[in-house]
């Protein structure tokens, strides 16, 4: 192995997307958006379909000049109500924020993180406000915490990943990022040269224009194998 390749194989910082990678935001949001739609008089609309449209609107806003996550969520709800021809109050987004304390970790998370302790520093990196991350039960403390609020920017344009590299005292040879989102994790990290493990829990096909990840896993259980053995 060349020196550069050897370094690339030995990450000292492993970062994780939170919502969708560590925490089941899809399941938790379905309940919250069901409440939002009922209160907006649109109980006939499929909550998951509506949530996916709302999430796509959020991601489009991540590319714009920084606004707090809560503001983006409210603006995207207003837009999605209009798209679905629903006369709803965008302040109903409070039901989504209230749900954060109920979001559950995926069953593979605790075991995998425990296996990584002592082998690399662990980070979380999330398009989120600090208070919402604090309300989320991650089950453990992380060595490095990076949020959109702290970085004053989001993942897709690279702002949050550049903040991660600086805050984590890492470079592209010593960082492995694990994330589920094609349009935030892969689009934001790969152009910076960051090694990415796509945690493809739902078995999706990579969308056109999305950079190819370095690794693709169905859950987090394979992440420790991406690090060198401790006796190497």
Per-range role (PLM):
Residues 1-14, 45, 110, 114, ...:
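Asp-based, Mg2+/Mn2+-dependent phosphohydrolase catalytic module
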Residues 7-107:
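N-terminal helical cap/lid subdomain that shapes the substrate entry/recognition surface
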């Amino acid at each position: 192995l060349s020196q550069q390749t050897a370094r690339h194989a030995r990450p000292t910082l492993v970062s994780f997307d939170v919502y969708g990678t560590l925490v089941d935001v899809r399941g938790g949001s379905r309940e919250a958006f069901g409440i939002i739609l009922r209160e907006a008089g649109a109980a006939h609309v499929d909550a998951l379909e509506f949530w996916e449209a709302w999430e796509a609107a959020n991601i489009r806003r991540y590319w714009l000049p920084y606004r707090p996550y809560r503001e983006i969520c409210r603006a995207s709800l207003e837009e999605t109500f209009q798209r679905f021809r629903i006369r709803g109050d965008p302040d109903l987004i409070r039901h989504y924020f209230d749900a954060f304390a109920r979001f559950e970790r995926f069953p593979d998370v605790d075991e995998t993180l425990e296996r990584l302790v002592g082998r690399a520093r662990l980070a979380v990196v999330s398009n989120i406000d600090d208070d919402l991350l604090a309300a989320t039960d991650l089950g453990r403390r992380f060595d490095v915490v990076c949020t959109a609020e702290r970085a004053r920017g989001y993942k897709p344009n690279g702002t949050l990943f550049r903040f991660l590299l600086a805050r984590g005292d890492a470079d592209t040879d010593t960082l492995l990022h694990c994330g589920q989102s094609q349009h935030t994790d892969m689009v934001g990290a790969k152009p910076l040269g960051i090694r990415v493990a796509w945690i493809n829990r739902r078995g999706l096909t990579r969308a056109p224009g999305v950079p190819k990840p370095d690794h693709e896993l169905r859950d987090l259980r394979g992440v420790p194998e991406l690090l060198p053995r401790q006796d190497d």
